[in-house]
Amino acid sequence: DYEKASEYFEKGLEYDLNPKLEYVQDMVETYGYSLLNQKRIQEMMFLENVYNEFAVSADYVFLMGLAYMNNGLFDKAIDEFNKAKLYKLCKIEGCNSYKADYNIGVIYECLGNKEKALENYKKCGRYDPALNGIKRIGYN
């Protein structure tokens, strides 16, 4: 129940929290995903307000990319997905590699740039959504 989860995250975030603690980072990231899953896209932009404190992980930077992407800020989204790929470690598999490339490909596909979309989809290896993207834009 994302709505109930969001309520609890919001209560938890009212406290004075140390952003260096992993559970605090997890809470902020999970709250962002709960907003995304509820289609509360505009509200995801709160992530900008705490960027300097939390952009210490690929997971957060990737989530910021999703926030920008879903709010139509495509250049910023591409920048964040590329930044996420600079991190060695991540908690969510692929957010510092093929999932970032996939989302960049989706953006280029939406913008009508099939060549750049294909280039990014190809970086995703055997990731099914990227393979479907390649087919969708007319390449096999």
Predicted regions and their residues:
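TPR-repeat structural position
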Residues: Y2-E3, R40-I41, F74, K114, ...
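Single-residue signature of alpha-solenoid repeat helices
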Residues: A5, E43-M44, A77, A117
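Hydrophobic/aromatic packing residues within the alpha-helices of TPR/SEL1-like helical repeat arrays
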Residues: F9, L47-E48, F81, Y121
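Flexible helix-coil transition and linker loops at the boundaries of alpha-helical arrays
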Residues: L13-D26, Y87-G94
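Amphipathic alpha-helical segments of tetratricopeptide repeats
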Residues: L13-E14, N52-E53, N82-K88, G125-R126
